Each structure stands twice: as C-alpha cells, then as structure tokens.
Amino acid sequence: GGSDVSAFLAKVDKRAVGGEALARLLIVYPWTQRYFSTFGNLGSADAISHNSKVLAHGQRVLDSIEEGLKHPZBLKAYYAKLSERHSGELHVDPANFYRLGNVLITVMARHFHEEFTPELQCALHSSFCAVGEALAKGYH
C-alpha cells in the first residue's frame, strides 16, 4: 500500500534513480527529447545519461512524486499547478507521465533486486498511475 511506497521511496537515491529513469525515457522514447531542448547535449545515450540537467530534473520529478504521495486524497489539487504547466505551457503528451512511471519501475527493479517484490511493484505502479492521472488533469 501507500505506506510501503513511502517507506521504499524514502530509501531511494533520488538523483541516481530519478536521473537514470529520465535519461532512459529520453533514450527509449527519443521524441520526448523535444520537451528538453534547453537541456544541452542530448545527442547520444551517453550524453543524455551524463547530462547534469537531465539528472537534476529526474531527481526533482522523484522528489515531487514522493511529496505528492503524502497527499493521496488530494493528489489532483497537489499537482494542479504542475499539471497546468505541463499541459498549457509545455504541451507534454500525458502518455509520457505513464511512460516515465514504467521506466521508474524498471530502474527501481534494477537498483533494488530482491527487495523489489511483485507486491511493491504493484503498489508503485498504482501510485505512479495516480500521479499520472493527477498530472493529466490539466488536459481535460
């Protein structure tokens, strides 16, 4: 459940995991790079994986998810401004929120091996989907 997710996220190195996840999103789904045109060199997988702006934004995303999940009954309100920014200003395809959630799960499984049980994966998936829905709210 939610408390398991919170306890797990508290242990996660946000820069390492968030940064790797955002880098992988940009590599695996290269069309997402258009949202990060101000981030400098995204010319290769290696450049993306070592780009300090990508790593910092990945950390910011994971910090935001951890903080947002402390407001489960109020997620849409918590993410209202961020949702408007991603929809109105940045025109991010909301499907990318779900893609990033899936990539985060992949990276977390890589980092946490045995501790990353199917039950934890299920709880994280539900949590990331809820965050994705809250962020997609600005699109309706």
Curated annotation (Swiss-Prot):
Keywords: Heme, Iron, Metal-binding, Oxygen transport, Transport. Coiled coil: none annotated. Pfam families: Globin. Signal peptide: none annotated. Heme b binds at H57, H86. One of its GO terms (biological process) is hydrogen peroxide catabolic process. It comes from the Eukaryota. Residues 1-140 form the Globin domain. Transmembrane segments: none annotated. The keyword Protease does not apply. GO terms for molecular function: haptoglobin binding; heme binding; metal ion binding; organic acid binding; oxygen binding; oxygen carrier activity; peroxidase activity. One of its GO terms (cellular component) is hemoglobin complex. Hemoglobin C tetramers polymerize by the formation of disulfide bonds. The deoxy tetramers of hemoglobin B and C associate to form molecules believed to be trimers (B+2C) of very low oxygen affinity. Heterotetramer of either two alpha-B chains or two alpha-C chains and two beta chains. The beta chain is a component of adult hemoglobins B. And C. Belongs to the globin family. This is Hemoglobin subunit beta. It comes from Aquarana catesbeiana (American bullfrog). The gene is HBB.
